């Protein structure tokens, strides 16, 4: 048991090192909704934020206070007012907003300052800085309704924020900002976080919600969404009456941020311990990313990919699942291979060997990394190989397999006799392996 834990620790550390190097010196904007702050797991989140800071990541933390404000209003018997799902902040509400936000600022600052206590980095000082980094303006009047002290961002002093980040501080920004006339305004945390991420040219914007991320109809987490897909999900949730959940608010901001140059926005759970670290320091992550460009890339292999392909297929060759290929053979046939890469690691591959005269192709050397076999990489490769075969004028595709017969049958392949193989392939058939032959029409 102890040996297994040690192995897990070593493997986990090895896998995280490339991400530590990649993230160091980058700017992350972290959006903490009031729901996350009042959850029992918030102390762990704060500790993990402190750990990110110790690794040299430049952090801007934006906090919201929606449930705390609502509780404060209820305690003072002051009815909240909304117009088009936006809070109307009258003078009384503003005082209660400032009170709730001020208490949270003090609490978060204290927690971040102590976040490295009881860790090997105990004694390391974290400087948390707040200030008038954001300048607000009023939302104004809409359909005859005055939003009073509800506002929006007018300007961000990114130079001042960058100076604090350069000095090693964590910048903490709350939902109350002042205008050029000295008035205070109540802003949404998602607007502040989004505008900050864009202005600071942040590498990432990170948000928290009650679930593990965005889920599909089966309840499985969707690991990656493009902005148009995220926008469609927002519209779907709004149609169901969900306008202000953590998921909807973050997705709205993430769509704008990605379209304005922020490379990746991450949505993770505040309820489970360690999600922030799992999302940032593991290849597969744990939540949902909103990205302009996929972390995965499917493309034709080049000579530089041979090492990654060999590393992927060797275990399968040793188990007898794949026919052994030497490096020399792979070098000669590399133009026949298609690979899927994730963060520069080859996680899947397949090859297409055309028999032009017979108008048929062989899909061979199909391999998917064990960590990714529960997803759709196999189907993606099959679709790409089939498309390549059609472009070559081939009308059929065949496979030889000893283990994946049902998988191919489920995808339109039919078992056939060896005699239906192309003549040259028939001569090379290995009767000791007794591979099954399956063929599909490309249509």
Curated annotation (Swiss-Prot):
InterPro entries: AceGlu_kinase-like_sf (IPR036393), Acyl_CoA_acyltransferase (IPR016181), Asp/Glu/Uridylate_kinase (IPR001048), GNAT_dom (IPR000182), NAGS_kin (IPR033719), NH2A_AcTrfase (IPR010167). This is Amino-acid acetyltransferase. It is found in: Cytoplasm. GO terms for cellular component: cytoplasm. The keyword Amino-acid biosynthesis applies. The keyword Transport does not apply. CDD domains: AAK_NAGS-ABP, NAT_SF. Pathway: Amino-acid biosynthesis; L-arginine biosynthesis; N(2)-acetyl-L-ornithine from L-glutamate: step 1/4. It holds the Pfam family Acetyltransf_1. Keywords: Acyltransferase, Amino-acid biosynthesis, Arginine biosynthesis, Cytoplasm, Transferase. It comes from Salmonella arizonae (strain ATCC BAA-731 / CDC346-86 / RSK2980). It comes from the Bacteria. It is an enzyme of class 2 (transferase). Homohexamer. One of its GO terms (molecular function) is L-glutamate N-acetyltransferase activity. The gene is argA. Its main location: cytoplasm. Belongs to the acetyltransferase family. ArgA subfamily.
């Amino acid at each position: 048991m102890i040996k297994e834990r040690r192995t897990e620790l070593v493997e986990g550390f090895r896998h995280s090192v490339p991400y530590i190097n990649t993230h160091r010196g980058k700017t992350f904007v972290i959006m903490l909704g009031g729901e996350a702050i009042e959850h029992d797991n918030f102390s762990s989140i704060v500790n993990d934020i402190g750990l990110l800071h110790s690794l040299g990541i430049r952090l801007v933390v934006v906090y919201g206070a929606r449930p705390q404000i609502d509780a404060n209003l209820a305690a003072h018997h002051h009815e909240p007012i909304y117009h088009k799902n936006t809070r109307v902040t009258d003078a009384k509400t503003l005082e209660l907003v400032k009170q709730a936000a001020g208490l949270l600022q003090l609490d978060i600052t204290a927690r971040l300052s102590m976040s490295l206590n009881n860790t090997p980095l105990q004694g390391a000082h974290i400087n948390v800085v707040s200030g008038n980094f954001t300048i607000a303006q009023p939302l104004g009047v809409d359909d005859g309704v005055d939003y009073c002290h509800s506002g929006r961002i007018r300007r961000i002093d990114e130079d001042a924020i960058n100076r604090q980040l350069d000095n090693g501080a964590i910048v903490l920004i709350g939902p109350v900002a002042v205008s050029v006339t000295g008035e205070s305004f109540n802003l949404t945390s998602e607007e502040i976080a989004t505008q900050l991420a864009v202005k600071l040219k942040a590498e990432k914007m990170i948000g928290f919600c009650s679930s593990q991320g965005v889920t599909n109809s089966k309840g499985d987490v969707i690991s990656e969404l493009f902005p148009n897909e995220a926008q469609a999900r927002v519209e779907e949730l709004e149609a169901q009456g969900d306008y202000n959940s953590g998921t909807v608010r973050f997705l709205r901001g993430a769509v704008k941020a990605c379209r304005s140059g922020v490379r990746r926005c991450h949505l993770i759970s505040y309820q489970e311990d360690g999600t922030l670290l799992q999302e940032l320091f593991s290849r597969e992550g744990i939540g949902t990313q909103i990205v302009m460009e996929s972390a995965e890339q499917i493309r034709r292999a080049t000579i530089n990919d041979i090492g990654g392909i060999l590393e992927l297929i060797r275990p399968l060759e040793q188990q007898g699942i794949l026919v052994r290929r030497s490096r020399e053979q792979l070098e000669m046939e590399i133009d026949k291979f298609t690979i899927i890469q994730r963060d520069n690691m080859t996680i899947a591959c397949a090859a297409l060997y055309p028999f032009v005269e017979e108008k048929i192709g062989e899909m061979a050397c199909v391999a998917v990394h064990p960590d990714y076999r529960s997803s759709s990489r196999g189907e993606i490769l099959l679709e790409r190989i089939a498309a390549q075969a059609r472009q070559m004028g081939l009308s059929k595709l065949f496979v030889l397999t000893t283990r994946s017969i049902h998988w191919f049958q489920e995808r339109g392949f039919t078992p056939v006799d060896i005699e239906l193989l192309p003549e040259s392939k028939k001569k090379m058939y290995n009767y000791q392996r007794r591979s099954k032959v399956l063929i599909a029409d490309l249509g």
